[in-house]
A protein has these predicted regions:
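Short beta-strand scaffold positions
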Residues: 87-88, 181
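Conserved active-site segments centered on acidic
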Residues: 1-81
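Positively charged, polar, low-complexity stretches
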Residues: 151-230
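Phosphate-binding/catalytic loops
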Residues: 84, 90-150
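Short helix-capping segments at alpha-helix termini
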Residues: 27-34, 100-104, 230
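Conserved beta-strand segments of alpha/beta enzyme cores
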Residues: 36, 65, 107-109, 153
Length: 230
């Protein structure tokens, strides 16, 4: 079991968003029993407060419920309790290193490092007011974190309304070369022989109100994954 603690300044925007996004990804992947996930603040400014309403609304728009979450402060004992303590920016990282007198076990990580955005900060909506950008950053970081820890890549077709959007999601998640064509034969080649990301794939199919041709084509994509051994 892997224990993850997400950390930001106040524990009312970014770190609770990461906590509940990661919990949702783990649920979709069927890996709930393999992870313990929580979040905390480096400061004491918001202790006991719920998730900030605009952040809570964005989570709700994506079907994620964070009811009952209140801010709590990082404790020295967290370093022993958790396997990974993941900050949202360099200030969080500095505060954690100070709290724990360094990082002797190599447990302190920056979330967007997992997405190949080394040293970048998750946008802080308390200042930017751009909660959608924070969602995007958190989702990207958590998806790549799940991949790094479990080899699982979630291919999410639920928002796709056109066949081209299905391939857009495939390109984002598998990260195969741009010269590969957008067709089922090319997808099979990627899955069976060409470099791509992930060792286990979870496909989320289009919603019932998606166009019929999109739902049918997504079914064909699902069969290609099965034929390729995934």
């Amino acid at each position: 079991m892997t224990k993850i603690l997400f950390v930001c300044h106040g524990n009312i925007c970014r770190s609770p968003a990461a906590e509940f996004v990661m919990k949702e990804l783990v649920r979709i992947a069927g890996l709930e029993t393999e992870f313990v996930i929580a979040s905390a603040a480096t400061s004491d400014e918001e202790l006991g407060n719920p998730v900030y309403p605009p952040m809570r609304r964005v989570l709700k728009e994506h079907g994620i419920d964070c009811a009952g979450k209140t801010a709590r402060q990082l404790r020295r004992s967290d370093y022993e309790e958790y396997d990974l303590l993941i900050g949202m920016d360099e200030e969080n990282m500095w505060n954690m290193r100070r709290k724990f007198h360094g990082d002797v076990a190599g447990k302190l990580k920056n979330l967007l490092d997992y997405a190949g955005r080394e040293g970048e900060a998750v946008a802080d909506p308390w200042f930017t007011r751009d909660f959608a950008q924070t969602w995007d950053d958190v989702l990207e970081g958590c998806e790549r974190l799940l991949e790094a820890l479990s080899g699982t890549v979630i291919v999410d077709f639920t928002a796709c309304a056109e066949i081209s959007e299905l391939y857009g999601e495939l390109r984002r998640k598998l990260r195969y070369e741009s010269w590969v064509g957008d067709n089922l034969d090319a997808l099979y080649d990627v899955l069976t022989g060409l470099p791509h990301r992930g060792t286990r794939f979870v496909l989320r199919m289009p919603l019932d109100d998606a166009p019929t041709e999109v739902r049918l084509y997504a079914g064909r994509i699902h069969r290609v994954f099965a034929d390729a051994g995934y």
